[in-house]
Amino acid sequence: LGDVYKRQIICCLDESGSTAGDLAAWGKAVALTLLEIAQSEGRKFALVHFSGPGRFQTDVFLPGQSSLEEKLHAAETFLGGGTDFQTPLAEAERLMREGGFENADIAFITDGECSLPETCVEMLQKAQSELRFTVTGILLDEGNAGMDFSLKPFCQNIYRTSELTGDQIVGEIVLDRV
C-alpha cells in the first residue's frame, strides 16, 4: 500500500518531563525527519505534541505551505509535565474525522511511561477498523531497553531507539506503511 498510495502522517510526540534531554532530542529528530519525508512527497503532516491529560499542541504542515519558521517553532516546543496517551490519540482521531487527514496513519513517539485504559484501547480499535489507519510506535528506550508493554495494546508495529538509529527507524516506518 505504501508504494501505491502515500498516506498522510499524524505524528504524536511525547513531550512529558520524563523525555527531557536526550530522549526529547531523539523524538524530535524522528518527527522532523518524518515531516521532511512527507513534505518531499507532497503529503500532509500533523505533529501532535503531548504531555499530561488535555495538554497538547497540534502543528499542521500542508504540502508546499510551511515555512522554516513554522518548522523551527515545532522543533523548539516542549510541553513538559506528566504523560497521557488518550489526549494525543483523541486529537489524531479528530484530525482524521474533521481535520482533512482522512487518509492518515499515526506515528506514536514515546518513552512508554504511561498506559492506555482498556476502554480507550477498545475505542481506538473501533476507530482503526472504521478509518483504516495503523499506529506505529517508536519507543524512546535508549539506555533503558524495555517498556513496550504500554504500546503493545494499540500499536501494530513498535520500533526501539535502543535497537535502531533514528534514520533506520524512519526508513523502516516509511517502507512499512507510512
Where on the chain are the PLM-derived regions?
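Short, small-residue-biased leader/transition segments that mark boundaries at the very start
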Residues: V4-Y5
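Structural motif
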Residues: Q8-I10, N103-A107
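Short acidic, Gly/Ser-rich segments with clustered Asp/Glu that frequently serve as metal-coordination loops
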Residues: E15-A25, E113-L116
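An active-site-proximal "capping" alpha-helix that borders the catalytic cofactor pocket
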Residues: W26-E41, L47
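Von Willebrand factor
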Residues: R55-F56, S67-A104, C114-L116, I138-M147
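Acidic, Ser/Thr-rich peripheral helices and adjacent loops at domain boundaries
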Residues: V60-A75, C155-L164
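VWA/integrin I-like adhesion module and closely mimicked acidic/polar interface patches used
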Residues: L79, G112-T161
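C-terminal helix of von Willebrand factor
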Residues: D84-A90, M147-V178
